[in-house]
Amino acid sequence: MNKILGIDPLKKFIFGISAFVLLFWQLNVGAANATALREVDRTVNLNETETVVLSDQQVAKGERIFINTCSTCHNSGRTKSNPNVTLSLVDLEGAEPRRDNILAMVDYLKNPTSYDGELDLSQLHPNTVRADIWSSMRNLNEEDLQNVSGYVLVQAQVRGVAWGGGKTVN
């Protein structure tokens, strides 16, 4: 008798509670919680002698900047224009000067040079010095550059060979 549209009120109530529980669970187990990293994973080189522990927020901000600004050419740590030089720790350590720390990477994002350090790449690689050419870098400040550099270093540590490893790994 109390059926509305052919559905028993008790079934409607149970369905409503189930939907609420599933929705509430999704909100609490979302992507933000999935990106929480251990402190050891967020510890990266600040310079050649010091390390720094990045906050989850710094890594998340760096990820957002990387996706919006860098991922077109550096998807999964690879380098579109030169697959032989990636954003892996091995390649960053092998650069001249080394780019395996936040401050060195920030320097590169301001004044990019070739892997051997000999050639100025300011007209070929996005940077903040030539923001007239590279509009994607125009609004990035020092903190943004540090966050995106930290994100790259964290990914290189956490993902290992999958970061910059190419199609055979990803």
Swiss-Prot record:
Cofactor: heme c
Domain of life: Bacteria
Subunit structure: PSII is composed of 1 copy each of membrane proteins PsbA, PsbB, PsbC, PsbD, PsbE, PsbF, PsbH, PsbI, PsbJ, PsbK, PsbL, PsbM, PsbT, PsbX, PsbY, PsbZ, Psb30/Ycf12, peripheral proteins PsbO, CyanoQ (PsbQ), PsbU, PsbV and a large number of cofactors. It forms dimeric complexes.
Keyword tRNA-binding: no
One Pfam family in the UniProt entry: Cytochrom_C550
Keywords: Electron transport, Heme, Iron, Membrane, Metal-binding, Photosynthesis, Photosystem II, Signal, Thylakoid, Transport
Identification of the protein by name: Photosystem II extrinsic protein V
Localization, UniProt: Cellular thylakoid membrane
Main subcellular localisation: membrane
Listed GO biological process terms: photosynthesis, light reaction; respiratory electron transport chain
Cofactor info, note text: Binds 1 heme c group covalently per subunit.
Signal peptide: 1-34
Protein family per UniProt: Belongs to the cytochrome c family. PsbV subfamily.
Presence of the UniProt keyword Iron in the record: yes
InterPro entries linked to this entry: Cyt_c-like_dom, Cyt_c-like_dom_sf, Cytochrom_C550, PsbV_cyt_c550, PsbV_cyt_c550-like
Bilayer topology annotation: Peripheral membrane protein
Taxonomic lineage from the root: Bacteria, Bacillati, Cyanobacteriota, Cyanophyceae, Oscillatoriophycideae
Role: One of the extrinsic, lumenal subunits of photosystem II (PSII). PSII is a light-driven water plastoquinone oxidoreductase, using light energy to abstract electrons from H(2)O, generating a proton gradient subsequently used for ATP formation. The extrinsic proteins stabilize the structure of photosystem II oxygen-evolving complex (OEC), the ion environment of oxygen evolution and protect the OEC against heat-induced inactivation. Low-potential cytochrome c that plays a role in the OEC of PSII.
Residues that, per the record, bind heme c: C70, C73, H74, H125
NCBIfam families: PS_II_C550
Gene3D superfamilies named in the record: Cytochrome c-like domain
GO molecular function annotations of the record: electron transfer activity; heme binding; iron ion binding
A cellular-component GO term for this protein: plasma membrane-derived thylakoid membrane
